[in-house]
Design a protein with these regions (language model features):
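Substrate/ligand-engaging "lid" and interaction regions
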Residues: 1-504
Length: 504
């Protein structure tokens, strides 16, 4: 393969991926062996980012390579400005995607073809609604990020006061949000007797199916209580755990694909690990994902807890400290002595004790696995990407463990330090004086509070609206205050060393 790549680099012409050029791709590129013209849609997926294409779309592609699930092809959809550009890119290459697996021992390349169309993005989401009501669609799946569910951070319920939710409740036929579009589509499916569908969240949220159910049913109830009852009683919302590290695509990733002789305007790079655990709860059928490595289970809670509390929380430990010290990527954070010590100590001493075993994996084994994955030098997963939307990520990934630790009287010093590092990062400057660009939907508010917390640390707990009952715990308040004071007085490295060298 290396010799073939060298030969390709000597030629300037790139092969633009399309149905017509699949046979022209280099011999080392794996490609669809099925007739894509015979694929039929079965899934509408909202949120065609990199993760979906490297994960869910890949699993479906693997089934299609076996000659199965040919009537479960994906129709892409979205409602954001990004989605319009993404739609143009993917349609220009027949909805094919080049996946490059980056392993420390080498790389492999695959073009997947499980997606066949991309819904036009229109005002009022009329085209999306129209596609979701068609009887051939059996699953509506989503990757809209952890912060995209309009949750009240303290209660976990739908924030019915949010302006976009208020708008959708009063303008059901021309909604702004994904969830408003789903509610309207379900109303029409019910009216036209096209049957219920499975609504499948693929986001990093514990109980993501339960959260999606609550969001959709609560929004429907605001305008049509009988519809809300029909949705709750007839549609299914399976919980799932998803896992694969997928960096954002930038110039580096596009250049990697070009070096292979391929022109793809929206390629995806990913690590050599995937996991998908799904609650087997589908009201209108599903692909046989278990044939290609997906774990179908009656209970995914233990898998979710292990992944969210160790991997996702671990990402926040690394990224917040790394941003303050101007590190660029997660593998750089893992190679940084103090940051790695913080990551390893907090995980082993304060998070892992609250995580149960899952079949075939203990928390200790899982920590070893994710440490190896995070340290992969080929995956240039940026600190900025991982630290984005800290409000949603700390609330969803770190705070559940803090609550467990408080309730059990366990150690919280490291967890408090992690939260203090987030507050320090949100102040907006690094230790070298450089400015951190806004990186959160609520950045302006967080930054204003973080600046005041420099002198009065508990302001951060009291006014960010992310902590709820945690902010009322006197022990946590005292330790958080101590940790943030130490960060500002002595620096991040000193604060970490002090914590890691303290008696257990």
């Amino acid at each position: 393969v290396d010799e073939l790549i060298k030969d390709l680099r000597s030629h300037e012409k790139l092969i633009k991926i399309s149905d017509d050029t699949l046979d022209d791709l280099p011999v080392f590129v794996k490609k669809p062996n099925y007739d894509r013209s015979k694929l039929k849609p079965g899934i509408v997926h909202i949120g065609l980012g990199n993760f979906h294409r490297a994960h869910q779309a890949w699993y479906l592609h693997r089934l299609m390579q076996r000659g199965e699930a040919l009537d479960w092809a994906i129709v892409g959809a979205g409602i954001m400005a990004f989605d319009k550009e993404q739609r143009q890119k993917l349609l220009s290459q027949d909805c094919l995607t080049t996946l490059v697996e980056l392993d420390p021992d080498g790389q492999s390349v695959e073009v997947i073809g499980s997606m066949i169309d991309y819904v036009e993005i229109t005002d009022g989401n009329s085209a999306l609604i129209e596609r979701m009501i068609q009887s051939d669609i059996k699953i509506i799946s989503l990757t809209v990020t952890e912060g995209g569910y309009f949750q009240d951070p303290n209660t976990g319920d739908l924030d019915c006061t949010h302006p976009d939710i208020q708008f959708d409740a009063g303008n059901t036929q021309s909604p702004k949000t994904v969830f408003g579009a789903i509610v309207e589509a379900l109303r029409l499916r019910r009216l036209q007797r096209n049957g219920p569908v499975t609504l499948q969240s693929c986001d990093n949220l514990q109980g993501n199916g339960n959260i999606l159910r609550k969001t959709v049913v609560s929004l429907a109830k605001m305008s049509d209580p009988s519809l809300a009852s029909w949705i709750d009683e007839n549609c299914s919302f399976p919980n799932s755990m998803v896992d694969c590290i997928v960096p954002a695509t930038g110039r580096t990733e596009i250049d990697i694909v070009k070096s292979l002789g391929i022109k793809d305007t929206a390629p995806v790079t990913h690590e050599n690990f995937r996991q998908w655990v799904i609650e087997d709860n589908f009201c209108a059928g599903r692909p046989a994902w278990e044939k290609v490595g997906v774990t179908m289970s009656d209970d995914v809670h233990a898998f979710e807890t292990m992944k969210i509390c160790l991997l996702n929380a671990g990402h926040q430990i690394l990224a917040n400290a790394g941003e303050i010290l101007e590190l660029q990527t997660i593998d750089e954070c893992m190679a940084h002595n103090e940051i790695f010590s913080l990551f390893d100590t907090v995980q082993r001493d304060e998070i892992a004790p609250h995580v149960d075993d899952v079949p075939g994996m203990t928390p200790e084994q899982y920590l070893q696995l994710i440490s190896k994955r995070f340290a992969n030098p080929k995956i240039k997963d940026t600190v900025r990407r991982v630290a984005f939307d800290g409000g949603a990520r700390h609330s969803g990934f770190v705070h559940p463990t803090i609550r467990k630790a408080i309730a059990s009287g366990s150690k919280i010093e490291g967890l408090a330090l992690v939260e203090a590092l987030w507050a320090r990062m949100c102040e907006g400057t690094r230790e070298n004086g450089s400015v951190i660009k806004p990186n959160d939907p609520s950045w302006a508010s967080y930054q204003e509070i973080a600046k005041r917390a420099k002198n009065t640390p508990c302001v951060w707990l009291d006014e960010t609206h992310d902590y709820g009952d945690i902010a009322q715990n006197e022990a946590f308040r005292a330790i958080f205050t101590e940790q943030l004071d130490r960060i500002w007085s002595h620096g991040v490295k000193s604060a970490i060393v002090h914590y890691c060298s303290s008696d257990p």
